[in-house]
Amino acid sequence: MLATTHMLYVLIATCVIPIFGAALSKTVLYQAPDECRWSGGGEHDITLVCHLRTINSELENTNFSVIQPQNTVRLRLECNDALFFQSSLSPDSFRSLVELRDLTIEYCKLGNLTDGSFRGLQELRNLTIRTHNGDWSTMSLEMASNSFVEFRQLERLDLSLNNIWLIPDGMVCPLKSLQHLNASYNKIQDISNFYFSASLSSRKARVCGSTLQSLDLSANKMVSLPTAMLSALGRLTHLNMAKNSMSFLADRAFEGLLSLRVVDLSANRLTSLPPELFAETKQLQEIYLRNNSINVLAPGIFGELAELLVLDLASNELNSQWINAATFVGLKRLMMLDLSANKISRLEAHIFRPLASLQILKLEDNYIDQLPGGIFADLTNLHTLILSRNRISVIEQRTLQGLKNLLVLSLDFNRISRMDQRSLVNCSQLQDLHLNDNKLQAVPEALAHVQLLKTLDVGENMISQIENTSITQLESLYGLRMTENSLTHIRRGVFDRMSSLQILNLSQNKLKSIEAGSLQRNSQLQAIRLDGNQLKSIAGLFTELPNLVWLNISGNRLEKFDYSHIPIGLQWLDVRANRITQLGNYFEIESELSLSTFDASYNLLTEITASSIPNSVEVLYLNDNQISKIQPYTFFKKPNLTRVDLVRNRLTTLEPNALRLSPIAEDREIPEFYIGHNAYECDCNLDWLQKVNRESRTQPQLMDLDQIHCRLAYARGSSHVSLIEAKSDDFLCKYASHCFALCHCCDFQACDCKMECPDRCSCYHDQSWTSNVVDCSRASYEQTLPSHIPMDSTQLYLDGNNFRELQSHAFIGRKRLKVLHLNHSRIEVLHNRTFYGLLELEVLQLQSNQLKALNGNEFQGLDNLQELYLQHNAIATIDTLTFTHLYHLKILRLDHNAITSFAVWNFLPSYLNELRLASNPWTCSCEFIDKLRDYINRHEYVVDKLKMKCDVISGNSTQQMVIYPGSGEPASLPVVQCSQTLPLGLDNNFNYAEQAGGENASNATSTKMILNQPPKLDYIPILVAILTAFIFVMICISLVFIFRQEMRVWCHSRFGVRLFYNAQKDVDKNEREKLFDAFVSYSSKDELFVNEELAPMLEMGEHRYKLCLHQRDFPVGGYLPETIVQAIDSSRRTIMVVSENFIKSEWCRFEFKSAHQSVLRDRRRRLIVIVLGEVPQKELDPDLRLYLKTNTYLQWGDKLFWQKLRFALPDVSSSQRSNVAGQSCHVPINHASYHHHHHVHQQAMPLPHSVHHHQQQFMLPPPPQQPGSFRRQPSLHQQQQQQQQIRGNNNTTQQQQQQQAALLMGGGSVGGPAPQMIPLAGGIQQQSLPLPPNQQPTPASRNLHM
């Protein structure tokens, strides 16, 4: 047993220890320094990447010895390219990395490489040093001749982007295994130091570069290539010397390059080529000479290059004298010839005869005006012929003879006015034909011979109609481009045989009409451009195109638009710059559409609703319209929204639910809305917008909120402010009269809770009626105050009138008044208790009047007054009790009056923040001045103390003296300096009596001054207590009476108790036996509010009510009046959702109105009215006005809306609270008996559908059946499958994207990578040149625009 256990332990140790050791060794082996990380795939393809600031600079020293040498095979060092500090490599820097095979140094600003910089790297195979020293124009990389002496096995050396000026002698000679050398993008002028010349090498007994296979010297400063300069490179296959400044090549510059296959001399300054240049390079396969100035070609210069496949002579100055039959003799294997952008004006008839293998011929951008007959007859393998941008005017019958394998023919940007009918007879394989930008007046009949044609471009011609049948027979045509012609009418049948057509571009024509059904046979169409025409209607054009995903009809004259005009699979739609006034949705199919990008900008839209916008939309442009109203919940249930643009419209206000979104998941970005550049009014309905970006995830992110400016409905200063800078009490609405819902005396003249604006005044309120501003400024009131000043006024402006005097208790009852302006009103007298009852008054402005005295009781009761302005009056006397009870006074202005003496130190509050006393004729009595100065010294809030002066009367003259001089500042007037007897500067004959009053002592007391007078008691304390208690009791009784409804609602919502509720009176005998708790009557346009807000809260809340919704639960086809009567009889309450939509739609229908009136005339107590949004009173029906007066009236958005609604509804039983909403609908409706009526469009359109809230519905007593038919709609899952199938069919390959770009974006041949199709407001643009979204539409450019 013990032996068995021992063996088991040994076995476990044998298995576990190697595994643990391997894991541990791998962890230890692949440890990287702090600045480095390992990257790559397998164990044998791993690279150590180090991100350094610099190497051995003044900032830091770099120690590469910390890198593990045994596992580091590949090392990449990247310095910070933002730091301009020089790096350096010290000798033996990499000596420890003996296994290193690949070393890359990038962005390290090395100035030199010393002899021992790379000592020890004997196994290195690849070395890349790119310092990017070109970032420093004065810094270059200098190398020692022995810098690379260690690299005996180096195969690849990259020294590009180092700003190298000079190569050390024989630098690469020690590199016996070097195969690839890249020294591009430097400043090298002379390559003789490379010792690549056999003659120089033999002279110095050194042979260098014999193993090189590729040499890249492009983008340097070489000006010439002498004879045999590269003759030692016998194995060289690729030579790149492009982008230099070479203007001279020696006759035998390529001597010794026997293995050369590819030579690139593009972008130099060559004007000619030596005749013997290619004498020893007979293996050449590719020659690139484009972008030079070659104007001479020696005859037969290419004659011995039998292996040549590619010859690129584009962008030179060759003319017809040097491009002739002798030029291409011997090039029997040439496959691509590029002669574009030269000066060729004519071609010999047999010029291309030696080129039997030619496949691609480019002759664009020359001066060719005619093509000899049969010129291409020997090019039987040619598949691409580019003749764009020449001067060809006619294509004759034999011009294209022999091109039986031609696939692409580009003749665009010529002067072609005629093509022979048989000119394309021999081009039967042609697939892409470009004839745009010519002078064709009709579609060429020659097209009848190219039945395999896939793309045809005849844009930018003068074609006015499609008459011949040549184009109608192109059954394989994939894309047709006819933009910028003169087409005026498209008749039905023109495109019928083009069954493969997927892209159609008819933009920028003069089309006024397209016959309905013209495209019904082209079911494969995916993209259509009709922008820039004169179409007035698109009805019947696109409904039969199930695969259409892209449609541009902008810049036309459309006045009507309906979603029934487009297929449900359309994903991108542009209708901007038309005359559309409404986004119609007659069949209510917004939930079935697939639109993701929709541009309806620059139209005449005035209103948008939820049905105006498809539910699938992601990007929506509605800018530059005339939109003045956005219906509530317009953007609700649009889950894919990412951006909405509403700038430059006519919006003046937005209610909170106008931008309401469905709740957004936390992992999704909130949609971005742009709503700026509208004439907003900062009224009471817009205060919510200021903080919308701080709301929950049911409101969008307003990206331009800080740029929104609005006009204040009421402003006593600037009327335009930035929205985010507006104060909360700036958001006001104007009103003439208003009566609160709980006010019961509105029909009587004397009604305190009725807000009625006085004559000649303007009145404003905020959303919650917290602010109530009454402005009667300069209203020409004489002697008396305006009548009926609202009791709830918070700001009252009466300035600029003529009142003379204000009676006692003039403002009694205005207990909420905070600001009162009475300035500039010629007031002479304030009676006692003038402002009594203004318990909340904070600001009182009485300046610039004619007050002469304050007798003590004028401001009694203003316990909360904070600011009192009395300047610029004629006040001479002030009673000592005037200000003593103003405990919260902060600002008091008494300047510019007639006060001579007032003991401010005894009778002013000590908690002031600002006091002004200047410009009064203060007495210079030393007793007064000493106390006044002491008061000023102790209180900093006397802000005008330096301006205070007193008057000294001496004889017939009055002298002013400074009371409180500034420190260190000379006074312009003498300063009062009191001694024990006289003020300083006055003689002993000065009469103090004269100082007080006049010329003699008898007048000395003429100015009234009451000092230290004992306070008067106006009321007996007991009487005050009794009166206070009585007032308190009366206020409590009044509050209970006024707010009795709120109290009942609160008690019901909190405790379930109904106060003052007579069960015998309020409950019908059979009420509890009724099937439903409430029948909800509403407009179909408000269905979203009912289904998403009202019904879920009532049916699924704590008290689960059973509701009957007519849009959901009524049998389709039933007789509506009788059905409504039965629904109301079966319900304990009737909820009527009154909105502008309800008034303009359902209530105006005779049957609906009659049914409601007949049932509700005697049952008004059972009716609950919910007002949704603003309902214009003038448009209300008289019956509705009566309903609103006599029934429970709830405003959506009220803070206690749900509590009041539940209070108005009957109580539900406890058993019902636990039931699931809707389970009382026992009898399911027989859907087979449904009947549905529509005036169907001439094309069959899918009927709208909605997802039912309940799976079961109740059955009302059967109404009279109407004949008709009902078509059950597909489920949501089926719709998603259909949309996915449509999207799947629209997937295109890269080749199709190339064709789309050419057909939709511009004319010309297709070359290079396909531009990506990017849907923007202006159409699909090239990704490299995107247009700004929603720019003013302009005619499409020929190349960049679609």
From Swiss-Prot:
It comes from the Eukaryota. Gene3D superfamilies: Ribonuclease Inhibitor, Toll/interleukin-1 receptor homology (TIR) domain. Residues 1074-1209 form the TIR domain. GO terms for cellular component: apical plasma membrane; plasma membrane. Disulfide bonds join C682-C710, C684-C733, C757-C763, C761-C776, C924-C950. Keywords: Cell membrane, Disulfide bond, Glycoprotein, Immunity, Innate immunity, Leucine-rich repeat, Membrane, NAD, Neurogenesis, Receptor, Repeat, Signal, Transmembrane, Transmembrane helix. Induction: By Gram-negative bacteria, in the respiratory epithelium. Up-regulated during vesicular stomatitis virus (VSV) infection. Residues 1235-1346 are annotated as: Disordered. Residues 22-1021 are extracellular. Glycans are attached at N63, N112, N126, N182, N291, N426, N468, N505, N552, N640, N823, N832, N956, N1000. One of its GO terms (biological process) is axis elongation. The keyword Signal applies. LRR repeats lie at residues 97-120, 124-146, 151-174, 176-198, 209-232, 234-256, 257-280, 282-304, 306-330, 331-354, 355-378, 380-402, 404-426, 427-450, 452-473, 474-497, 498-521, 523-544, 546-568, 570-591, 593-614, 615-637, 638-661, 790-813, 814-837, 838-861, 863-885, 887-909, 912-938. PROSITE patterns: LRR, TIR. Its main location: membrane. Coiled coil: none annotated. InterPro entries: Dev_Immune_Receptor (IPR050328), Leu-rich_rpt (IPR001611), Leu-rich_rpt_typical-subtyp (IPR003591), LRR_5 (IPR026906), LRR_dom_sf (IPR032675), TIR_dom (IPR000157), Toll_tir_struct_dom_sf (IPR035897). Residues 1043-1346 are cytoplasmic. The keyword Disulfide bond applies. Belongs to the Toll-like receptor family. This is Toll-like receptor Tollo. It comes from Drosophila melanogaster. The gene is Tollo.
